[in-house]
């Protein structure tokens, strides 16, 4: 079957006023920092629907959107080989994002073992973000083609370990049980992920990773409602038959993926490509996703990013987006 490619164009222009960090306490053994940013963004309608900080958008017009992030981080020296660390970041409530309360992003405590790596416990990115994160550069504008984000861009209940040694970066994570993850009616029993990355002398970065989720089956239709859209496409059905979907509830989910990058984001030219494959138990088809972006950052504070995202399932394009964004971050000096 020949499938047409439906392309949605998302565009946004942003002006970011950022105070990256300020030290508010330091006694040589312990220190506490605060950080944050304020962003104003002009978006077309399609882009506004893809903003990560918008709860919902019901109209069909262009919009001016503001977003505020605030965070706090701390460190205490335990001994010459280890430090205790803590971190928390929130999305602040604003009139334009639909949230009337604080929304937690990353939040964890841990031990920084210096050359032995860092172990953290709490809410954050699992190890597979090493793969998907190379194209997660749009600040607020994200279409999230990869199924890694199906339950949100942050996960709670994570053990996370990171080690950099001998030219390689290793990340390992373990997911503990979470009920009704991201209000999806899906319960996670446990999960794990691992990723390995390296960068060549020419500036090319290569990474490969895999993640696994053990899913808890539910005996009620609420537990299967999350999967009905994919099942309709997979079996070419026209109705949301929850009883049918309930019989095909998956018991596990596996993501595999790779990424290739060139350069460093925010420093001149940056290029990135990643691809992922997702397998749900009891699904006869795999989900495939591809994202690619090109970014250039100028010394005067301007940057421009263009990217393409594709997600396919059962010979159907679930998503096909061309995204363009221009950004300006206020700098101490401005030269054109």
Predicted regions and their residues:
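Conserved adenosyl
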Residues: 191
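Outer-membrane beta-barrel proteins
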Residues: 45-49, 95-99, 130-133, 179-184, ...
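Gram-negative bacterial Sec-dependent N-terminal signal peptides
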Residues: 1-22
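Detector for outer-membrane/organellar transmembrane beta-barrel domains
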Residues: 194-331, 335
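Extracellular loop and loop/strand-boundary signature of outer-membrane beta-barrel proteins
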Residues: 54-59, 146, 182, 243-247, ...
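Outer membrane beta-barrel
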Residues: 23-43, 58-177, 188, 197-200
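Primarily extracellular Gram-negative trimeric autotransporter adhesin
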Residues: 19-29, 226, 331
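Transmembrane beta-strands of outer-membrane beta-barrel pores
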Residues: 40-46, 90-94, 123-127, 165-167, ...
């Amino acid at each position: 079957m020949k499938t047409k490619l439906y392309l949605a164009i998302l565009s946004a222009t942003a002006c970011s006023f950022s105070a990256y960090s300020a030290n508010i306490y330091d006694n040589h053994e312990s220190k506490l920092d605060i950080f944050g940013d304020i962003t104003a963004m002009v978006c077309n309608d399609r882009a506004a629907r893809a903003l990560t900080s918008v709860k919902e958008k019901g109209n069909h017009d262009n919009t001016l959107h503001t977003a505020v992030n605030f965070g706090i981080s701390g460190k205490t020296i335990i001994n010459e080989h280890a430090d205790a660390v803590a971190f928390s970041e929130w999305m602040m409530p604003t009139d334009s994002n639909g949230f009337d309360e604080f929304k937690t992003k990353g939040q964890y405590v841990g031990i920084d073992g210096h050359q032995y790596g860092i172990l953290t416990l709490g809410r954050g990115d699992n190890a597979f973000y090493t793969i998907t994160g190379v194209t997660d550069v749009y600040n607020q504008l994200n279409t999230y083609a990869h199924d890694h984000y199906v339950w949100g861009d942050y996960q709670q209940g994570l053990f996370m370990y990171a080690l950099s040694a001998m030219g390689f970066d290793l990340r390992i994570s373990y997911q503990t049980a979470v009920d009704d993850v991201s209000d999806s009616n899906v319960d996670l029993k446990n999960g794990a992920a691992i990723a390995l990355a390296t960068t060549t002398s020419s500036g090319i970065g290569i990474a490969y990773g895999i993640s696994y989720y053990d899913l808890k089956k539910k005996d009620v239709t609420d537990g299967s409602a999350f999967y009905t859209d994919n099942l309709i496409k997979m079996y070419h059905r026209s109705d949301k038959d929850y009883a049918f979907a309930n019989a095909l509830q998956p018991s596990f989910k596996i993501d595999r993926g790779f990424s290739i990058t060139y350069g460093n984001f925010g420093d001149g030219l940056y290029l990135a490509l990643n691809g992922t494959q997702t397998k749900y138990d009891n699904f006869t088809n795999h989900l495939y996703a591809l994202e690619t972006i090109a970014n250039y950052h100028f010394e005067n504070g301007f940057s421009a990013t263009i990217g393409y995202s594709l997600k396919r399932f059962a010979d159907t394009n679930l998503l096909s987006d061309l995204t363009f964004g221009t950004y300006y971050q206020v700098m101490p000096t401005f030269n054109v």
